[in-house]
């Protein structure tokens, strides 16, 4: 229904559809991958009963900041996307949206996100500036380092410490275990994503962990996912989570094993499906957290 409504917008206003494509709200996978770990932190911080105010702020913030991240990413890549098969039709490349319009939209989305943060507390407000800096600089990292996925992981995980300070006013040390776990997981799944474009990236000189890891890519991804699960298990013990949480981790581990097997030939479609599949791992962990608190 969600996608049907968006597609009807294309028929009613092709111009509006250009901005839908720029923000990629028609492709919710990025929202899911940002939403689930944010909700892990929200639920754990709230001990299973987070305030509706916190839930609303962080869910809305995920939608807005993911859209903002897509806009600034396409702005940064506007001169190289035309050389990559997957991105050659993006609105900034085709000229359907101008660079100025993209920057204005980015500013609007970031401003709306900041308005949400103003309804939290001073610690969370200060932390939000770190998240903005990471989101803004990530798209440019692939020009200078083979580790842009690490910066993306840092950006995608920044909502987790913010969730703790917003909900409790404090930032326990164990919250950083969640942060590290999500950073490792993000590097893993975004390397699958980068493997889709690796041949094009090698031709145009774009850097990524997929390029850096080479033939060791899948083994390194699986290792990162294993380390992420280890950090989550340790965080679970610190936050006194129980059996349902660990069942969620087992489901996530099964997801990771399937991804490793399905990408054994490194076909583009298989790598992209493995990237998409990580949404289910994140959801499984979230449902494990919810069930663990609800069924005590």
UniProtKB/Swiss-Prot annotation:
Alphabetized GO MF terms: 4-hydroxybenzoate polyprenyltransferase activity
Transmembrane spans: 28-48, 52-72, 102-122, 123-140, 146-166, 169-189, 219-239, 241-261, 275-295
Catalytic activity from the UniProt record: all-trans-octaprenyl diphosphate + 4-hydroxybenzoate = 4-hydroxy-3-(all-trans-octaprenyl)benzoate + diphosphate
Record-stated family: Belongs to the UbiA prenyltransferase family.
Compartments reported by the entry: Cell inner membrane
Keywords from the UniProt entry: Cell inner membrane, Cell membrane, Magnesium, Membrane, Transferase, Transmembrane, Transmembrane helix, Ubiquinone biosynthesis
Topological relation to the membrane, as annotated: Multi-pass membrane protein
Biological function: Catalyzes the prenylation of para-hydroxybenzoate (PHB) with an all-trans polyprenyl group. Mediates the second step in the final reaction sequence of ubiquinone-8 (UQ-8) biosynthesis, which is the condensation of the polyisoprenoid side chain with PHB, generating the first membrane-bound Q intermediate 3-octaprenyl-4-hydroxybenzoate.
Pathway: Cofactor biosynthesis; ubiquinone biosynthesis
InterPro entries referenced in this protein's UniProt entry, alphabetically: HB_polyprenyltransferase-like, Prenyltransferase, UbiA_prenyltransferase, UbiA_sf
GO cellular component, one term: plasma membrane
Named cofactor requirement(s): Mg(2+)
Gene: ubiA
Predominant location: membrane
Name this polypeptide is given: 4-hydroxybenzoate octaprenyltransferase
GO biological-process terms attached to the record: ubiquinone biosynthetic process
EC number(s) from the headed UniProt entry: 2.5.1.39
Superkingdom field: Bacteria
PANTHER family according to UniProt: 4-HYDROXYBENZOATE POLYPRENYLTRANSFERASE, MITOCHONDRIAL, PRENYLTRANSFERASES
């Amino acid at each position: 229904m969600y996608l049907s409504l968006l597609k009807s917008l294309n028929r009613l206003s092709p111009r509006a559809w250009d901005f839908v494509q720029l923000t990629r709200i028609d492709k919710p996978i990025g929202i899911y991958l940002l939403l689930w770990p944010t909700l892990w932190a929200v639920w754990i911080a709230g001990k299973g009963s987070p305030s509706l105010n916190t839930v609303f702020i962080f869910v809305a913030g995920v939608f807005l900041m993911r859209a903002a991240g897509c806009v600034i990413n396409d702005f940064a890549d506007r001169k190289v996307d035309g050389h990559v098969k997957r991105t050659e039709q993006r609105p900034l490349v085709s000229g359907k949206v101008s660079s100025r319009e993209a920057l204005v939209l980015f500013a609007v989305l970031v401003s709306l996100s900041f308005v949400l943060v103003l309804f939290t507390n001073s610690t969370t407000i200060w932390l939000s500036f770190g998240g903005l800096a990471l989101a803004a600089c990530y798209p440019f990292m692939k020009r200078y380092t083979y580790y842009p996925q690490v910066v993306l992981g840092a950006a995608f995980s920044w909502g987790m410490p913010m969730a703790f300070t917003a909900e409790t006013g404090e930032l326990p040390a164990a919250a950083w275990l969640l942060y590290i776990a999500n950073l490792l997981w993000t590097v893993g799944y975004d390397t699958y994503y980068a493997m889709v474009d690796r041949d094009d990236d090698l031709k145009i000189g774009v850097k990524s962990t997929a390029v850096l890891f080479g033939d060791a890519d899948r083994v390194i991804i699986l290792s990162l996912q294993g380390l992420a699960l280890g950090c989550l298990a340790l965080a679970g013990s610190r936050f006194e989570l129980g059996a349902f949480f660990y069942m969620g981790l087992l489901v996530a581990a099964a997801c990771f094993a399937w991804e490793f097997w399905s990408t054994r030939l490194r076909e583009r479609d298989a790598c992209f499906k493995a990237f998409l599949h990580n949404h289910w791992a994140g959801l499984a962990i979230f449902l494990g957290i919810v069930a663990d608190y609800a069924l005590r």
